[in-house]
């Protein structure tokens, strides 16, 4: 089936799909104060979703393109679930968040199909994949339209990988007690086996969101990147997120000696946001298999255990947490009790001495991850490094932090 036909088949005009903001039915919804963070964007008035401009631009989307799509959503007079929230248009039609971003992606997909130059075509496919991922954001369980957009994102990513430098392998790993999981191994030019970074992404992102990290930071240093979707989303959607948050990544890590392109004696883990919960768990549970663990804006204790901090987090992010935990009808109180069990300090890990070198980067006044969170990680390690990242200029400082983190990882993998 051609890519265009797949798009037409998946996205037949229908208006009965459940609108994204209604998928999680928590009882204690209320107004939230304005909030901004480098990794998550900000909760803009009249939007259900957090607008994550930094990460979208970092992934290659033009700021004007973001504004154009937002404008189409704002201008729609179609029926909304909540008249006060622009991105709650019901059904797959003009003004609906998924419709508008997927439409934008299809334009780039068409350009990719028409482009004769393989490299340029690959760039267009990658651009389309990123836009499809934004269409599916924040990837709530049971969001049929988002799942269809995600299928197109994965297909576009595979098309891009065939045309861009280096090579990509789609790999399946068995996990006892359930379905196998699919991972993508990104390899730089040259002969393997390669030192490899196991990427542990945030709960509101997909494994195909991190190509920029590989291309700009890891590949130039000859490092491969292995990505895996977090439990309950994407290729790992059949697995529920549990207190054993590192379960899937742990099984992949244990299987690496059987992967000929990976130097299993030189592996590090890198965790964004809740992905740091996975990475730090691995630092404790699989220390002999890891040379280093790096974290950025980690969510390992404070947000999971502090009700006051949870009350400042945007509704969308609480919905993401509830969705990943399978608590679609939970009160805030029930959600808080469950989240507390995911704290690595409550689990008795963080605070104990860990032999794995650990680095953690933080932004001051980050509502998701206070400085103490990163300090707790680095002081628990026998070889810890703490990095404070200035907020402004946000893009340049983000790039500098990633360069420093990559150099640190590279030093420990050599």
UniProtKB/Swiss-Prot annotation:
Name recorded for this polypeptide: Esterase FrsA
EC category: hydrolase
Species assigned in the record: Salmonella dublin (strain CT_02021853)
Reaction(s) catalysed (UniProt annotation): a carboxylic ester + H2O = an alcohol + a carboxylate + H(+)
Role according to the record: Catalyzes the hydrolysis of esters.
EC number: 3.1.1.1
Extent of the signal sequence: none
Similarity section: Belongs to the FrsA family.
Name of encoding gene: frsA
Molecular functions (GO terms): carboxylesterase activity
PANTHER family for this protein: DIENELACTONE HYDROLASE DOMAIN-CONTAINING PROTEIN-RELATED, ESTERASE FRSA
A Pfam family that the UniProt record links to this protein: FrsA-like
Keywords annotated in UniProt: Hydrolase, Serine esterase
